[in-house]
Every structure is written in C-alpha cells, then in structure tokens.
C-alpha cells in the first residue's frame, strides 16, 4: 500500500516542484513503484515530465476532479496515468483552476482528491503529490488524502514567515479531516551553504523546531543544473547524476524510506 506524500509550501519559487520530481525518480531508482501527481494548475510538474502543451492532454487531474464534483465515474487508470522513464504520473492543466472555483461551493469538497488516489494505493509504494503554493481548497484536498507532508523552504525570511502558517494549517487538517496526517519533515532547498543567510536560517529552524518537527539532513543546494534539467525535461539522475543536488535528492529518498546508511 502506497504512502501518499504531499510536497507543499506556502510560497512559490522554493524548489517544491523540482523536489517532487527528483524525489520521485530517486525513489524509483531504489526500486520503489512511484506515482507523481501534478495537483497545481500551473502544470509545472507536467512540463518537467516532458509534456509541452498540458492543455492538449485528454485526461488530467482536473478532468478527474470534475468527474468527482459532478458525481461521474472516474475513468480507468490506464486512461489518465502516463509514464516516463520508470515513473508514472498524472498530468495537470489550467482546467484545475476551474475545479478550484467549484470546490469552494461544494459540500464535502475536501475529500474529492481522496476518491481518486485511494483506489491507486495498492498499485504503488509511493504517491508524491505536488501542490500549488497556497493554502486554498486544492491544498486542503491534498492534505486530506496525504499520510505525510514534506514542507519545502528556501533560506529567505519571507519563506520562513509562511512556514508557521503552513504548519498551523496542517495541524487543523489533522484534527478535523485526516488524523493520519504527519509532517514528514522540513526540506531546505536552493541553499548556498557558503552564505551567512543559509546558515542563520538553518540554525533558526533547528532552534524553533528541534524535537518537534524533523528537519531533513539532506539540504538541496542551489545549482544551475536543477534549472537546466527542468528545461531539458531530464531528472537529475539522468542529466547530472554526479551533481551535488542529485546526491542530495538521493539522500532525501533514503531519509524518506528510512534506508539511511
């Protein structure tokens, strides 16, 4: 049965999607069966998987959510799950924006995504859900189905300010909608260990959350190879396997699975 892990943040531009993508491939490299779900209308994860025009995809997560909203049957997984280089994925498109608007007016809308992903648990070891950088209805849906959430943070004060809001939301969802939900950990991304700011933020995180919330040992460094790999739609394992960011994502996968050496 799959562990459903949401990768989220309160602020955009923190390397969340790149982390979802590369974590999925790092888990697959370990022999895990992985499904990545793009649950963001910007469809950045979909683009990472090499789909140049998400709007042309016949069945996306937006279509599936609309099926659920209109009490229609969700199609067979073979109709909406795509695969690339050993990782399965469900693409997204701007259609998810229309779904977001409808969710706000729908009773019990928090569990719409759960109705799609729960039947897929038995097919995978890990389901990674990449979400939009906000605390709206889509994010609540993802938190309601997730077993764990990885919170991506980059070493900037504004990103830190949003972190507390995000954690409060996770706790509310846990108490009201999903008592399984746990914070897997805080992931520092786009970090230049040589800068004073990165050191200060890392120390601040440790002081604030030590003993309460795990801070992953794997710190994702700021490197141009991450951006280049996204541009070429090649995960770091393929594009730059010896790069320090690739090694960090491999280490993260080991932390997530508990297979640390």
What are these regions (language model features)?
Residues 1-261:
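P-loop NTP-binding core
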């Amino acid at each position: 049965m799959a562990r459903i892990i949401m990768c989220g943040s309160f602020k955009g531009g923190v390397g969340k999607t790149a982390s979802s993508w590369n974590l999925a491939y790092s888990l697959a490299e370990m022999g895990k069966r992985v499904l990545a779900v793009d649950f963001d209308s910007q469809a950045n994860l979909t683009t990472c998987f090499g789909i140049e025009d998400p709007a042309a995809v016949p069945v996306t997560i937006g279509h599936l959510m609309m099926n659920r909203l209109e009490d229609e049957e969700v199609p067979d997984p073979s109709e909406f799950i795509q695969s690339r280089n050993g990782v399965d994925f469900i693409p997204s498109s701007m259609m998810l924006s229309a779904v977001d608007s409808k969710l706000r007016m729908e009773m019990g809308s928090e569990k719409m995504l759960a109705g799609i992903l729960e039947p897929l648990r038995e097919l995978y070891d890990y389901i990674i859900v990449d979400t939009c950088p906000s605390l709206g209805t889509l994010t609540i849906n993802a938190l309601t189905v997730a077993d764990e959430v990885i919170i991506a943070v980059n070493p900037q004060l504004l990103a830190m300010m949003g972190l507390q809001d995000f954690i409060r939301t996770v706790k509310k969802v846990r108490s009201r909608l999903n008592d399984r939900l746990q914070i897997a950990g805080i992931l520092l991304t786009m970090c230049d260990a040589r800068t004073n700011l990165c050191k200060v933020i890392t120390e601040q995180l440790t002081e604030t959350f030590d003993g309460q919330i795990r801070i992953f040992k794997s710190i994702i460094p700021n490197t141009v190879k991450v951006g280049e790999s996204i541009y070429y739609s090649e995960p770091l394992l393929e594009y730059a396997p010896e790069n320090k960011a690739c090694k960090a994502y491999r280490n993260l996968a080991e932390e997530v699975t508990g297979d640390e050496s």
